[in-house]
From Swiss-Prot:
Its cofactor is Mg(2+). Involved in mRNA degradation. Catalyzes the phosphorolysis of single-stranded polyribonucleotides processively in the 3'- to 5'-direction. SUPFAM superfamilies: Eukaryotic type KH-domain (KH-domain type I), Nucleic acid-binding proteins, Ribonuclease PH domain 2-like, Ribosomal protein S5 domain 2-like. Residues 669-728 form the S1 motif domain. The lineage of its organism: Bacteria, Pseudomonadati, Campylobacterota, Epsilonproteobacteria, Campylobacterales. Keywords: Cytoplasm, Magnesium, Metal-binding, Nucleotidyltransferase, RNA-binding, Transferase. This is Polyribonucleotide nucleotidyltransferase.
C-alpha cells in the first residue's frame, strides 16, 4: 500500500507492508530521489534492569550514491561520525515516546538506500523511523515529526534543501509530537562579509615587512534570544502539521497494540516514612556530596544500615527495595528544595554559577592550552595548529567529493573524572555528541580563511555536570592561547528545569545531580552578541515556549558572567611563540606548480626533507603554503621555491611583468594618479607608468575600491623590484 503526504515543503511517499514484513513495523519512505528504509524490531522477553533497552542505528549504504566503499575492505564497516550523530538524534527524539515501565529490547534501524544530494537525510530518517514505530505493535500513541529551519536572506525557511542550507545563517533541527517539543539542535552558520576589511597576507608581490600574518573576518551570525524563539515557534507549528498529518494518514494502518507487561513502579510507603523519620539528615548529607561516586557510596551505606535494622528484617524489606525507595526519596528532596526553598543541593540560588578558575598555556610544548574549572567540573583543552594536510577528510552521501574539515574538536571522558575505574575505550556516542556540540559552538568564531588546520581536544579531568560547556569555554581560550585570532570569545552554560505541578524552576549551570533528577538538559553557547549553538533534551512530555524563553534569557545572564571572566583571562594570555608552527603563504604562477612538484614528486620531496617543512599547493590558484617548526627553514624553503619558479620562468620564456619590470626610475615619495588594474585579497595593484604596477596594501585602504577606478598614490617603499604604495 502506498501513501503520499505533502507536508512542510516536501512530498513524502510511504510504502507500507511492502518490505521487511517480519519486523514489528517497517516503512519505505521516499522524498525526491532519496529512499530510506526504517524497521522496528522487539524482543518478547523483558530485561531485568530498570531502563529502556532501546537501540537506534542509522546506516548509510554507499551504493545509495552510486559508490563502492574505499579502502581495503570493500563494504560498509564502522559507522562514520555523521551516522553516529544521526543515530543519536533519532534516539533522543523517539525515546520519550515509550511508556513508563517498558523494558523489552527494541531496535530501530534506518538504512539509506538511495540519496538525493538536495534532500536532508536527518529529517527524512527521523520521520521514517517515527512512522515505522507508530505503525508497529509497540504502544506509541503519536508519531514524532522532525523539521529543520534555515534563515536565508533574512527569512526563515522550513526544511531547506542542502544547497539552500549552505547559504543559511541558521541550522535549527527540532523534533516533537503535536505541540510538544522533545529535542532541539541548533548552530549558527558564519559567512563572509561583503565589505573590505583589513587583511595582512603573505605574498611575494608584497612588501616583506607587511608579511606578519593572515587575518580575515566574517559574520558569526549569532542569534538573539527573541529571534531564536521565533525560529523555534515556527518549527513548532511545522511539527504540529507534520505530526497530525502522519497520525491522520496512518491511524488506520497501525498494528494492534501488543499485550505487553510493564515493570511496576516500586512503591512502599512504609519504607519512605521510615527513611523520612530516621534518615532524612543522612540523605541530605549524602546529597551534599557533590561527586557522583561519593554520593552513591553514601546512599549505599544508608541502604545497608536500614536493611540491617530490626524494622527492615521484621517487615521483609530487602536492600534492593530500600535502595530504590531511597533513590526516589533523594530525588524528592532535591526537587522540593529547588521548588519550595529556591535552594540547590550545593547551597546555590537558582541563577548562581559555580566558582570558576582559568589557567592558560600550562603545557609548555603544546601550541595552546587552557585549564577551565567550574565547580567540580574541570576540562583541560588543548589546541594544535596544522596545515591543510592535517585536515579531517570525510565523505558524505550528499557530497560528490570528500570534504576537508580544517576545524576538529575531540572530547574525551575518562572514568577517573567521576571516580570510576572504567576501561579506556574508543569514543562512544556521548563523546562524539559532546564534541560535536562544542565544535558547533566554536566554529562561527573561527576564521574561514585561516591557513591553519585546527584540532582542539578537551580532556575532562573532573565531571559534575556541564562538561561539554566547560569544553566550549576552555576551547575558546585555548584557541586564543595558541595565537589564533578568533572573532569573539564563546562561552557555554547548561540549564536545567524542574516541574512540580503548576510550579517550575529554571536552573543555571546544573550539576550532575540536577541533570539526573531534573526534567530538562538545555545547553546554550554563544558570544556576547548572541547564540551560536544550543542543544535541548526534554524528559517531560514537552515544554512551552514561555518556559523556553525564560531559560534562554537566564542562560544569557550566566553567559555574560562567564564571558567577563574569560575576557580577563584572555588579557593575561602569553602566547608561546617558540612552539608555534611558522607559516608562509604566497602565490606563484599556477602553471609553475608542476615545476615545484617535479617529476613524480621528486622536487617537492627534496624540499620537504631538506628544510624539514610541510608544503601545501593549490594548483588552481597557484597558492603555496609552507609550515615548519623553525622560521629560518620555512623562509629558506620559500626562497628556494621562488628561485625554482624564477628559473623556470627565465629559461622557459615566461616573464612575470609585475615582478621583473625595471623599477630603477622610481623613487620613494614619487606621486602618481593611476588606474586600479587588479584587486586581490591583500590589496590593490595600481598602474603607475611604463607598464609598472605598485601594491596598495589592504591595510592602507580606507574605502571600497574596484578595478578600473583611478586613485592618487605615492611610493612608500621599493624592495626586491617591488613597489609599495600609500594613499596620497
Amino acid at each position: 500500500m502506498q501513501c503520499s503526504i505533502e507536508v512542510n515543503n516536501q512530498i513524502e511517499i510511504f510504502d507500507l507492508n511492502k518490505v521487511a514484513k517480519q519486523a514489528a513495523g517497517a516503512v519505505l519512505m521516499r522524498v525526491k530521489n532519496t529512499v530510506v528504509l526504517a524497521a522496528v524490531a522487539r524482543e518478547d522477553a523483558q530485561v531485568e534492569e530498570d531502563f529502556l533497552p532501546l537501540t537506534v542505528q542509522y546506516i548509510e549504504k554507499q551504493y545509495a550514491a552510486g559508490r563502492i566503499p574505499g579502502g581495503y575492505v570493500k563494504r560498509e564497516t564502522k559507522p562514520g561520525d555523521f551516522e553516529t550523530l544521526t543515530s543519536r538524534i533519532i534516539d533522543r527524539s523517539l525515546r520519550p515516546l515509550f511508556p513508563k515501565g517498558y523494558a523489552y529490547p527494541t531496535q530501530i534501524v534506518v538504512m539509506v538506500l538511495s540519496s538525493d544530494p538536495e534532500v536532508d537525510l536527518q529529517v527524512v530518517s527521523l520521520n521514517a523511523a517515527s512512522v515505522a514505530l507508530y505503525l508497529s505493535d509497540i504502544p506509541v500513541n503519536s508519531p514524532v515529526c522532525g523539521v529543520r529551519v534555515g534563515h536565508i536572506n533574512g527569512k526563515f525557511v522550513i526544511n531547506p534543501s542542502n544547497s539552500e542550507l549552505k547559504n543559511s545563517a541558521l541550522d535549527l533541527y527540532v523534533a516533537g509530537v503535536k505541540d510538544e517539543l522533545l529535542m532541539i539542535e541548533m548552530r549558527s552558520l558564519p559567512n563572509e562579509q561583503n565589505e573590505i576589511v583589513p587583511v595582512i597576507a603573505i605574498d611575494p608581490m608584497m612588501d616583506p615587512s607587511l608579511n606578519e600574518g593572515f587575518v580575515s573576518r566574517q559574520k558569526m551570525n549569532e542569534f538573539s534570544e527573541d529571534l531564536m524563539i521565533d525560529a523555534i515557534k515556527l518549527a513548532t507549528e511545522a511539527i504540529l502539521k507534520g505530526s497530525n498529518a502522519y497520525e491522520e494518514a496512518f491511524r488506520n494502518y497501525k498494528k494492534e497494540t501488543a499485550n505487553l507487561e510493564y515493570k511496576p513502579e516500586i512503591e512502599n510507603e512504609n519504607v519512605a516514612i521510615y527513611i523520612n523519620e530516621f534518615y532524612k539528615e543522612d540523605v541530605k548529607a549524602a546529597i551534599n556530596q557533590m561527586a557522583k561516586s561519593e554520593r552513591a557510596s553514601e546512599l549505599s551505606k544508608i541502604a545497608k544500615q536500614i536493611a540491617l535494622s530490626e524494622v527492615a528484617q521484621k517487615e521483609g524489606w530487602d536492600e534492593a527495595l530500600i535502595s530504590n525507595i531511597l533513590g526516589k526519596y533523594k530525588k524528592k528532596l532535591v526537587r522540593t528544595g529547588i521548588i519550595k526553598d529556591k535552594k540547590r543541593a550545593d547551597g546555590r540560588g537558582l541563577k548562581d554559577v559555580r566558582p570558576i578558575s582559568i589557567e592558560t598555556n600550562i603545557l609548555p610544548n603544546a601550541h595552546g592550552s587552557c585549564l577551565f574549572t567550574r565547580g567540580q567540573t574541570q576540562a583541560l583543552v588543548v589546541t594544535t595548529l596544522g596545515t591543510d594536510n592535517d585536515a579531517q577528510m570525510s565523505e558524505y552521501l550528499t557530497e560528490k567529493n570528500a570534504v576537508a574539515d580544517k576545524f576538529m574538536f575531540n572530547y574525551n571522558f575518562p572514568g577517573f573524572s567521576v571516580g570510576e575505574a572504567s576501561p579506556l575505550k574508543a569514543p562512544g556516542r556521548r563523546e562524539l555528541g559532546h564534541g560535536n556540540l562544542a565544535k558547533r559552538a566554536l566554529y562561527p568564531s573561527i576564521d574561514l580563511n585561516s591557513p591553519y588546520s585546527l584540532r582542539v581536544v578537551s580532556e575532562i579531568l573532573e565531571s559534575n555536570g556541564s562538561s561539554s560547556m566547560a569544553s566550549v569555554c576552555g576551547g575558546s581560550l585555548s584557541l586564543r592561547a595558541a595565537g589564533v585570532e578568533t572573532i569573539k570569545l564563546v562561552a557555554g552554560v547548561a540549564m536545567g528545569l524542574v516541574f512540580e505541578g503548576d510550579e517550575h524552576a529554571v536552573l543555571t549551570d546544573i550539576m550532575g545531580l540536577e541533570d539526573h533528577d531534573g526534567d530538562m538538559d538545555f545547553k546554550v553557547a554563544g558570544s556576547k552578541d548572541g547564540i551560536t549553538a544550543l542543544q535541548m533534551d526534554i524528559k517531560l512530555g514537552g515544554i512551552s515556549l514561555d518556559v523556553l524563553k525564560e531559560a534562554l534569557y537566564q542562560a544569557k545572564e550566566a553567559r555574560d558572567h562567564i564571558l567577563n571572566l574569560m575576557v580577563k583571562a584572555d588579557e593575561e594570555i602569553v602566547v608561546n611563540e617558540d612552539v608555534l608552527p611558522k607559516l608562509e603563504l604566497f602565490s606563484v604562477d599556477p602553471s609553475k606548480i608542476v615545476d615545484i612538484i617535479g617529476q613524480a614528486g621528486k622536487t617537492i620531496k627534496e624540499i620537504i626533507e631538506k628544510f624539514e617543512v610541510s608544503i601545501d599547493l593549490d594548483r588552481d590558484k597557484g597558492e603555496v603554503k609552507i609550515a615548519g617548526g623553525e622560521r629560518q627553514k620555512v623562509e629558506a624553503a620559500k626562497d628556494y621555491i621562488i628561485q625554482i619558479t624564477q628559473k623556470e620562468q627565465r629559461s622557459g620564456g615566461f616573464r612575470n611583468k609585475r615582478e621583473y619590470k625595471n623599477v630603477t626610475p622610481f623613487n620613494i615619495g614619487d606621486e602618481f594618479e593611476g588606474e586600479i588594474k587588479k584587486m586581490a585579497a591583500f590589496g590593490a595593484f595600481i598602474s603607475l607608468r611604463d607598464g609598472v604596477d605598485g601594491l596598495l596594501h589592504i591595510s592602507k585602504i580606507v574605502s571600497p575600491l574596484k578595478e578600473g577606478d583611478t586613485i592618487k598614490v605615492k611610493v612608500s617603499d621599493i624592495k626586491g623590484g617591488k613597489i609599495s604604495l600609500d594613499l596620497n
